Amino acid sequence: MRKPVIAGNWKMHMTCAQAREYTAMFLPLIEATPNDRHVVIAPPFTAISSMAEAVGGTRLELSSQNVHWEDDGAYTAEVSPTMLLEHQVRYAIVGHSEPRKYFSESDEQINRRARSAQAHGLIPIVCVGESDEQRERGEAERVIRRQVEQGLEDTDPDKLVVAYEPIWAIGTGKTCEASEANRICGLIRGWVGASELIIQYGGSVKPGNIDELMAMSDIDGVLVGGASLDPESFARIANYQTS
């Protein structure tokens, strides 16, 4: 049975002090959250250590916002799997549309990151999705399938998460219709050929649309950006209801 993963990606937000304050407010709000789902936050690297101390022994799990494929070396600004494991990090986001856009990350690099994460016992959250231009040209499915096939090559689909994040819906206020998001997630499941693959939707997820999204048969969680920066908002998302 697929256990949903509700993950908040803080991106380049929150100092260590702000992260501690947030955590103190957030943890009581998820004390009664059902155990049929994972609740995850991906803080900036600088806040991971203090977050690890704050969430120890609670149900809140940590993710990194990236991970390198080497354990150490001359890779300025990168972070290795072994460094993350020191701080009780369980997940690692790879292939997010922002590194793809701003740093020209390739599917091959994303695949190396994902394989390295798995090799060290981390669960990669592999992001895929089309731009507005690709969607308008009718290329969305071809683009997403390429990202899935190349990004997941030689990985174990039972030990990763795929996040479908249409780029045109990230931080824009535009949301992919739940039925369309579900259709794409179903296609991804078919391309991978893994019925138990966890597939998230990401793109302007908020308290107002979480229940509809999570009622979809092929959506197994969400990757939340801006709405995860407010503890009450993210708690409402974590406490989604489908009935």
Swiss-Prot record:
Q: What are the recorded GO MF terms, alphabetically? A: triose-phosphate isomerase activity
| Gene Ontology biological-process entries | gluconeogenesis; glyceraldehyde-3-phosphate biosynthetic process; glycerol catabolic process; glycolytic process
* Annotated compartments: Cytoplasm
EC class (word) = isomerase
Q: List the pathway annotation.
A: Carbohydrate biosynthesis; gluconeogenesis; Carbohydrate degradation; glycolysis; D-glyceraldehyde 3-phosphate from glycerone phosphate: step 1/1
Q: Which GO terms describe its cellular component?
A: cytosol
Catalytic residue list: H96, E165
Q: Which reaction does it catalyse?
A: D-glyceraldehyde 3-phosphate = dihydroxyacetone phosphate
Instruction: Give the main location.
Output: cytoplasm
- The yes or no answer to whether the keyword Isomerase is present is yes
Instruction: Specify which residues bind substrate according to the UniProt entry for this protein.
Output: N9, W10, K11, G171, S204, G225, G226
Any one Pfam family match given in the protein's UniProt record, by short name: TIM
Task: Report the coiled-coil segments.
Answer: none
PROSITE patterns linked to this entry: TIM_1, TIM_2
Q: What is this enzyme's EC? A: 5.3.1.1
Keywords from UniProt, A to Z, are:
Cytoplasm, Gluconeogenesis, Glycolysis, Isomerase
Matching entries from InterPro entries are given as: Aldolase_TIM, TIM_sf, TrioseP_Isoase_bac/euk, Triosephosphate_isomerase, Triosephosphate_isomerase_AS
Instruction: Describe its assembly.
Output: Homodimer.
Q: Give the record's family classification.
A: Belongs to the triosephosphate isomerase family.
Primary role: Involved in the gluconeogenesis. Catalyzes stereospecifically the conversion of dihydroxyacetone phosphate (DHAP) to D-glyceraldehyde-3-phosphate (G3P).
Q: Which HAMAP family match?
A: TIM_B (MF_00147_B)
| Matching PANTHER family | TRIOSEPHOSPHATE ISOMERASE (PTHR21139:SF42)
Listed name of the protein: Triosephosphate isomerase
Name the species this protein comes from: Prochlorococcus marinus (strain MIT 9303)
